[in-house]
Amino acid sequence: MELGLALRLVAPPPLLPCLSRRALSLPPDFVSSRVLRGRRIHASRLKHGAGVVCNAIMTYSGVEEEEMVEEEMEEEAEPAVSTRPRLELIEKPDRSLALLDEYESEELGTSLCANHRSGYVAVLGKPNVGKSTLINQMVGQKLSIVTDKPQTTRHRILGICSEPEYQIILYDTPGVIKKEMHKLDSMMMKNVRSAIGSADCVLVVADACKTPEKIDEMLEEGVGNKDIGLPVLLVLNKKDLIKPGEIAKKLEWYQKFTNVDDVIPISAKFGHGVDDIKEWILSKLPLGPAYYPKDIASEHPERFFVGEIVREKIFVQYRQEIPYSCQVNVVSYKSRPAAKDFIQVEILVEKESQRGIILGKDGKSIKMLATASRLDIEDFLQKKVYLEVEVKVKENWRQDERLLKRYGYGGEIQAL
């Protein structure tokens, strides 16, 4: 399969109602995969509804009876259509394989700009410095989950920021850590290094509230080489939390003691300084056509983000080691035009005791988790869904390289 064509795997319906419903013509041998389209649709607002089944194998089963009856009727009325897409983190393609050529652009009514710029940007930094918040601001949509806990991001999340004159493709990477406790940690650092290998320039995000430190060691820990040979911008985040005088001192320190091209202070939470970052990136990106259609916000399909939403709710609801011991897999995603989409999710933990904590007394905790997840999933997809959640024990999954590769760490993500 040619890489340029691999980027075109989409099956448009059903899309978010306010977004483009244009379909790209595909060769007949391609397997369709719904790719997230559109921008500025946030998944943080909660709505009320129903449609959750929570069960842990051989441990807990709780079903809302009315909802089950409704779903059975819907199943009879409309047979389920199951899509099992391959979720890929595609490496940076050759520019001759860019997605849209001049003819295709004319067909789609989007003529190529003579000075159009496009390229890849790796976003690096230590855990909990605001990398994901920054990318969400730049893309205009919540793609990466955000919590107050470090090391929330595990995969290399791709976000696409497009305007008529440019296309910026951003890699949100896991936080760079010094000590790798599990095989999972080393696989996440592999994702960081692969992002650098695909990039045209690099953003290194630092916390303005913390004592300034040289980024050479961080680059060496995360990338394996402090001399990466790419333009580097140091993004000093959380400037809203310190006094202007302190910001000036830290800017001076970083400019003096770090080997970066520029330093820009921002507040990713409020979007302050984000336009300055875009301007800097565009000054470094080469001229070239868009790699993706302009209405696509990420190359990951919807089921990937469904799993991330559930994982975010685990981080919010549970404490200490529990969120870090969980792996969320979307086992089944069935799109049903005349009924609610059916989504089956499994949560893997490493110990029986952890499963008990996830479930809670009489299954109350897992039901709360599933309900919160469903509400955000419905808001994200802009449609009602029926969510089933299972909790299973998979001992030492964080040390199992075969499983980690299957779950998408250190390489491609494959649907289960």
From Swiss-Prot:
<feature type="transit peptide" description="Chloroplast">
    <location>
        <begin position="1"/>
        <end position="53"/>
    </location>
</feature>
<dbReference type="GO" id="GO:0019843">
    <property type="term" value="F:rRNA binding"/>
</dbReference>
<feature type="binding site">
    <location>
        <begin position="125"/>
        <end position="132"/>
    </location>
    <ligand>
        <name>GTP</name>
    </ligand>
</feature>
<feature type="region of interest" description="G5">
    <location>
        <begin position="266"/>
        <end position="268"/>
    </location>
</feature>
<dbReference type="InterPro" id="IPR006073">
    <property type="entry name" value="GTP-bd"/>
</dbReference>
<feature type="domain" description="KH type-2">
    <location>
        <begin position="318"/>
        <end position="395"/>
    </location>
</feature>
<dbReference type="GO" id="GO:0042644">
    <property type="term" value="C:chloroplast nucleoid"/>
</dbReference>
<feature type="region of interest" description="G3">
    <location>
        <begin position="172"/>
        <end position="175"/>
    </location>
</feature>
<feature type="region of interest" description="G2">
    <location>
        <begin position="151"/>
        <end position="155"/>
    </location>
</feature>
<feature type="binding site">
    <location>
        <begin position="172"/>
        <end position="176"/>
    </location>
    <ligand>
        <name>GTP</name>
    </ligand>
</feature>
<feature type="region of interest" description="G1">
    <location>
        <begin position="125"/>
        <end position="132"/>
    </location>
</feature>
<dbReference type="InterPro" id="IPR015946">
    <property type="entry name" value="KH_dom-like_a/b"/>
</dbReference>
<dbReference type="GO" id="GO:0000028">
    <property type="term" value="P:ribosomal small subunit assembly"/>
</dbReference>
<keyword id="KW-0547">Nucleotide-binding</keyword>
<dbReference type="InterPro" id="IPR030388">
    <property type="entry name" value="G_ERA_dom"/>
</dbReference>
<keyword id="KW-0694">RNA-binding</keyword>
<keyword id="KW-0690">Ribosome biogenesis</keyword>
<comment type="similarity">
    <text>Belongs to the TRAFAC class TrmE-Era-EngA-EngB-Septin-like GTPase superfamily. Era GTPase family.</text>
</comment>
<keyword id="KW-0934">Plastid</keyword>
<dbReference type="GO" id="GO:0003729">
    <property type="term" value="F:mRNA binding"/>
</dbReference>
<dbReference type="InterPro" id="IPR005225">
    <property type="entry name" value="Small_GTP-bd"/>
</dbReference>
<comment type="function">
    <text>Nuclear genome-encoded probable GTPase involved in ribosome biogenesis in chloroplasts. Plays a role in 16S rRNA maturation in plastids and may contribute to the assembly of the small (30S) ribosomal subunit.</text>
</comment>
<keyword id="KW-0342">GTP-binding</keyword>
<keyword id="KW-0809">Transit peptide</keyword>
<dbReference type="Pfam" id="PF01926">
    <property type="entry name" value="MMR_HSR1"/>
</dbReference>
<dbReference type="GO" id="GO:0043024">
    <property type="term" value="F:ribosomal small subunit binding"/>
</dbReference>
<feature type="binding site">
    <location>
        <begin position="237"/>
        <end position="240"/>
    </location>
    <ligand>
        <name>GTP</name>
    </ligand>
</feature>
<dbReference type="InterPro" id="IPR004044">
    <property type="entry name" value="KH_dom_type_2"/>
</dbReference>
<dbReference type="Pfam" id="PF07650">
    <property type="entry name" value="KH_2"/>
</dbReference>
<dbReference type="GO" id="GO:0005525">
    <property type="term" value="F:GTP binding"/>
</dbReference>
<keyword id="KW-0150">Chloroplast</keyword>
<protein>
    <recommendedName>
        <fullName>GTPase ERA1, chloroplastic</fullName>
    </recommendedName>
</protein>
<feature type="domain" description="Era-type G">
    <location>
        <begin position="117"/>
        <end position="287"/>
    </location>
</feature>
<feature type="region of interest" description="G4">
    <location>
        <begin position="237"/>
        <end position="240"/>
    </location>
</feature>
<dbReference type="InterPro" id="IPR005662">
    <property type="entry name" value="GTPase_Era-like"/>
</dbReference>
<dbReference type="InterPro" id="IPR027417">
    <property type="entry name" value="P-loop_NTPase"/>
</dbReference>
<dbReference type="InterPro" id="IPR009019">
    <property type="entry name" value="KH_sf_prok-type"/>
</dbReference>
<dbReference type="GO" id="GO:0042254">
    <property type="term" value="P:ribosome biogenesis"/>
</dbReference>
<dbReference type="GO" id="GO:0006364">
    <property type="term" value="P:rRNA processing"/>
</dbReference>
